[in-house]
Amino acid sequence: SSKLKLNNLIAIIDYNKYQATGKSDEILNIKPLSKKWISFGWDAIECNGNDHNSISKKINFLLKKKSNKPKVLIAHTIKGKGVDFMENDNNWHYRSPNIDEVKKSKIQLDI
């Protein structure tokens, strides 16, 4: 992407620090993630991925940025944010909620 100067490309990473089988740092530490992307020729910025306003502001910033590089937004998120029994619980990577859990989730998410 950087070689081709795809300056209209924006990648968004949902960086919740978990992989399929556990915490990312325990499997393969890739910190600092933004420096990795920069070393690959991308412009990289970070935001609070649980805050829609933060995401929107950072995307608008990237859209206006004068650069020949592709861009990446690293959105720091909490896995399962907003549902107390799902937050930071990697079991939800594999399973679906039952009816009672769906009801409880909807109440907690106010939907």
Question: Which sequence ranges carry the predicted segments?
Answer:
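Glycine-rich ThDP/TPP pyrophosphate-binding loop and its adjacent helix/strand module
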Residues: 1-111
